[in-house]
Amino acid sequence: GCDRHGQLCLHRVNVAPQYGDSFYDYVSDVNAVLSEAARRVVAEEGPFDLIHTHDWLTCGAATELKHATKRPLVGTIHATERGRGRGQLYGQQAERINTTEWQLSYESWRVICCANYMAGEIHDYFGTPADKIDVIPNGVDPTPFQALEGQDLSEVRQRYAGPHDRIVFFVGRLVHEKGVETLVRSAPAVLAAVPQARYVIAGRGPESEHLGHVVQELGVSNRVLLAGFIRDDVRNRLFRLSDCAVFPSLYEPFGIVALEAMASHCPVVVSEVGGLREVVRHAETGITIYPGDADSCAWGIRHTLEQREWARQRAQNAYREVLTTYSWDNIAAQTARVYERVVRERSATLW
């Protein structure tokens, strides 16, 4: 059966939890299960117009279904394995993932990605023709953030910071590519200029133990909190409370978390990398900094904390942009136009 939500019909497929040493082999097994389930849906519910899949993880099932049904495939590529490795492929699994990403770009009638930066990466790494790629950004729903307008957030503030602290907030996975060590290493310079700064770093990941050591080494453990995992509702409240949100990524195909901060009227400081440099315009909707550069990061945070009126104006500009460019209605309309084009072109083509 399926879960119906208006015009959306969602078929849930039970798959085994991850097993074995090879994640790639596990994903291949899951694709076999998904493919079989999809064929059943096709048999029961009749023909459909197109297939849309996201990233290499479901490429196998989507490609198989495409050839079995002679229906066009649209592929969204959010990030690439080579990009995550800063242009390198480390090990056999990375090479297999890279090959599957190439296959998805090859098999797709149109390829969607979320930033011009990613369009360049897909073109360079996979030889995908530039005119086969559509750039449609990710979006954010501002409603949960708007709902906090005027609410008492003192309980959350007491949990994470003092009454007069200036909160510098990060939320995300604690992995190397997010550049969190750069943020931690910016703390001494920021605290020298703004002693009431309070870093709240939320998230889990393989870097968390190392980051704890860096905090100790720098002697800033009384002003830098590694908060661990936080729920979305707590994250939203921290965005509202924070004086700035910092995303110092080394690799970032898009950076939806920056949009969430912007939807909260929170001033942002982000690395000038990947999709982040398209989401945030320096000195207009945020501050951009050099990736991997703690001095640059400290400058961006200090500027935001010290120049409150400028920061407020940038946050206002950013919020307006969220409501227009990054609204889901706008993104849905762009996606529908891609679908219409694919269906039109397929109808005029012999398979």
Locate each region found by the language model.
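Carbohydrate-associated surface elements
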Residues: 117, 139
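Short hydrophobic beta-strand element within catalytic cores of glycosyltransferases
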Residues: 267-270, 280
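Nucleotide-sugar donor phosphate/pyrophosphate-binding loop at the beta->alpha transition
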Residues: 72-74, 82-103
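Conserved donor-binding/catalytic core segment of Leloir-type glycosyltransferases
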Residues: 162-178, 184-187
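Short alpha-helical donor nucleotide-sugar binding micro-motif in glycosyltransferases
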Residues: 229-230, 237-242
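Conserved acidic donor-binding segment of nucleotide-sugar-dependent glycosyltransferases
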Residues: 282-283, 287-294, 303-308
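Aromatic "clamp/platform" in nucleotide-sugar-dependent glycosyltransferases that forms part
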Residues: 250
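A short helix/loop element that forms part of the nucleotide-sugar donor recognition site in Leloir-type
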Residues: 92, 146-161
